[in-house]
């Protein structure tokens, strides 16, 4: 009945095997681009770790933003509504904010 009507919407994503993966661009402050192919259900912690490893910097020294929203380790592309060729911006983490005069 109504339960059966609600099911197809959840299954629609599984119909296309190509839809399981998307390509994302990660752009650093120096305008360097690294492209990643990730599953829609993969935690973005993996992408962040891979990016930091390639750049040779600790993960806690950078922050990753998608459409102005900070990406947490547990976010997935699906949760954030990411699509093919979307851009993730990377910035140097800044702490503090007051002078030490």
From Swiss-Prot:
Placement of covalent cross-link Glycyl lysine isopeptide (Gly-Lys) (interchain with K-? in acceptor proteins): 97
Domain named Ubiquitin-like: residues: 20-97
Main location as per UniProt: nucleus
Posttranslational modification: Cleavage of precursor form by a sentrin-specific protease is necessary for function.
Domain of life: Eukaryota
Gene Ontology MF term list: protein tag activity; transcription factor binding; ubiquitin-like protein ligase binding
Propeptide cleavage-removed residue intervals: 98-101
Cellular component, GO, one term: nuclear membrane
GO biological process assignments: cellular response to cadmium ion; cellular response to heat; protein sumoylation
Gene3D superfamilies referenced in this protein's UniProt entry, alphabetically: Phosphatidylinositol 3-kinase Catalytic Subunit, Chain A, domain 1 (3.10.20.90)
A UniProt-annotated Pfam family: Rad60-SLD
InterPro entries in UniProt: Rad60/SUMO-like_dom, SUMO1_Ubl, Ubiquitin-like_dom, Ubiquitin-like_domsf
Subcellular location: Nucleus membrane; Nucleus speckle; Cytoplasm; Nucleus, PML body
SMART domains named in the record: UBQ
PROSITE patterns named among the record's database cross-references: UBIQUITIN_2
Annotated keywords: Cell membrane, Cytoplasm, Isopeptide bond, Membrane, Nucleus, Ubl conjugation pathway
UniProt record similarity statement: Belongs to the ubiquitin family. SUMO subfamily.
Function text: Ubiquitin-like protein that can be covalently attached to proteins as a monomer or a lysine-linked polymer. Covalent attachment via an isopeptide bond to its substrates requires prior activation by the E1 complex SAE1-SAE2 and linkage to the E2 enzyme UBE2I. This post-translational modification on lysine residues of proteins plays a crucial role in a number of cellular processes such as nuclear transport, DNA replication and repair, mitosis and signal transduction.
The protein's assembly and partners: Interacts with SAE2, UBE2I, RANBP2, PIAS1 and PIAS2. Covalently attached to a number of proteins.
Name of the protein in its database record: Small ubiquitin-related modifier 1
Species whose genome carries this gene: Gallus gallus (Chicken)
Lineage: Eukaryota, Metazoa, Chordata, Craniata, Vertebrata
């Amino acid at each position: 009945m109504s339960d059966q009507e609600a099911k197809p919407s959840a299954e629609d994503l599984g119909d296309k095997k190509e839809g399981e993966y998307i390509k994302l661009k990660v752009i650093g402050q120096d305008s360097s681009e690294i492209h990643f192919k990730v599953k829609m259900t993969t935690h973005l912690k993996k992408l962040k770790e891979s990016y930091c490893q390639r750049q040779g910097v600790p993960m806690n020294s950078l922050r990753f933003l998608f459409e102005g929203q900070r990406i947490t380790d547990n976010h997935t592309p699906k949760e954030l509504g990411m699509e093919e060729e979307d851009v993730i911006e990377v910035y140097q983490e800044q702490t503090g904010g007051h002078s030490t005069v």
